[in-house]
């Protein structure tokens, strides 16, 4: 297994040596986008294998929701690639330039980082997003996705490599580790420092902690954080209803979904019911403090101190009343 990883690392370093201009980068991404459109049926078929297995092994509902692909999610992946194509090429731009008194001219120029390793969990769209972003920024990437999304990740990586090959670019610019054994992650973190320049973990707390504890490679990552939405006493009601609904229910299983709503006490009587009814009517469970519960006519559960630090990743939300924006900020900073 270690030998396989070393071969992957060596191929990534070789791919990094190939210069690729902006036109070719965008052509590869454009062809990749077309391949996704053309092979939608194949992507959905492979994804079904992952979903069927997830149901069989009784994976948590929020993880299955992350895993499932459909027409809408594939359209989202396509839209993401289109946005990346439109981005200005981030490398070889002169950021700063100055001249010393002795006539020596210095330039600060953006360059690629090098080979990037990305370890992630159950979202198949991460394969496409990360591969596209790394390629646009000139960084070869080694992808290690979770076994729960194995077939979905594999088809996305194969389509990307096919697009690279079509455009005479080293297909090893994008490599997916198709080994399901957990030990491969440990080896990736501890034995690949000669080949990987930075590791990025994308997943839950346990994954990020493991990467931080084991990695001999520099890391770009985060550990914890709860997304909050604060509704001030000067807020517009209709806007607040729309923002809160979108922030919580657009996709409940992502780490960017709102988990706690903070609402100014002065507007609770007017704002509480229309905002929370919208959430409740769309299947969201309400967990609130006493002040909010007194004013909300719908069904809710009493919040405990532990609820303010919970990342539900599902259709649940905590609601707390605050006296002002300072109290809201202090609560978030806890």
Language-model features and meaning:
Residues 304-334:
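Conserved C-terminal structural/oligomerization subdomain of aldehyde/semialdehyde dehydrogenase
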Residues 86, 95-234, 238:
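Rossmann-like NAD(P) dinucleotide-binding subdomain of oxidoreductase/dehydrogenase enzymes
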Residues 1-108, 133:
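N-terminal Rossmann-like NAD(P)+-binding subdomain of aldehyde/semialdehyde dehydrogenases
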Residues 1, 5-9, 22-25, 29, ...:
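Generic structural signal for well-ordered, non-membrane alpha-helical segments
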Residues 25, 138, 199, 264, ...:
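Residue-level signal for inorganic ion chemistry
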Residues 2, 122-125, 129-140, 159, ...:
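ALDH superfamily catalytic-core signature
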């Amino acid at each position: 297994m270690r030998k396989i990883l070393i071969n992957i690392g060596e191929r990534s370093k070789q791919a990094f040596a190939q210069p690729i201009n902006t036109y070719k980068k965008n052509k590869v991404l454009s062809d990749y986008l077309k391949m996704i459109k053309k092979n939608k049926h194949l992507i959905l078929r492979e994804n079904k294998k992952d979903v069927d297995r997830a149901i069989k092994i009784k994976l948590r509902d929020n993880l299955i929701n992350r895993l499932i692909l459909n027409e809408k999610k594939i359209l989202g992946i396509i839209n993401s690639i289109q946005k990346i194509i439109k981005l200005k090429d981030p490398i070889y731009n002169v950021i700063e330039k100055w001249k010393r008194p002795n006539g020596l001219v210095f330039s600060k120029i953006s360059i690629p980082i090098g080979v990037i390793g990305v370890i992630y969990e159950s979202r198949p769209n991460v394969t496409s997003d990360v591969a596209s972003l790394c390629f646009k920024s000139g960084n070869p990437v080694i992808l290690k996705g979770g076994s729960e999304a194995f077939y979905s990740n594999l088809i996305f990586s194969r389509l990307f490599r096919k697009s690279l090959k079509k455009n005479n670019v080293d297909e090893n610019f994008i490599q997916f580790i198709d080994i399901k054994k957990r030990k491969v992650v440990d080896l990736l973190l501890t034995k690949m420092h000669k080949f990987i320049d930075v590791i990025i973990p994308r997943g839950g707390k346990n994954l990020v902690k493991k990467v931080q504890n084991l990695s001999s490679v520099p890391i770009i990552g985060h550990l914890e954080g709860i997304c909050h939405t604060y509704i001030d006493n000067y807020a517009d009601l209709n806007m607040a209803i729309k923002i809160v609904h979108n922030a919580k229910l657009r996709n409940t299983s992502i780490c960017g979904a709102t988990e706690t709503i903070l609402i100014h006490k002065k507007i609770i009587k007017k704002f509480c019911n229309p905002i929370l009814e919208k959430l409740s009517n769309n299947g969201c469970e309400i967990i609130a403090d006493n002040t909010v519960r007194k004013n909300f006519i719908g069904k809710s559960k009493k919040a405990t101190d532990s609820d303010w630090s919970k990342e539900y990743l599902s259709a649940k939300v905590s609601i707390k009343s605050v006296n002002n924006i300072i109290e809201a900020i202090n609560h978030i900073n806890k």
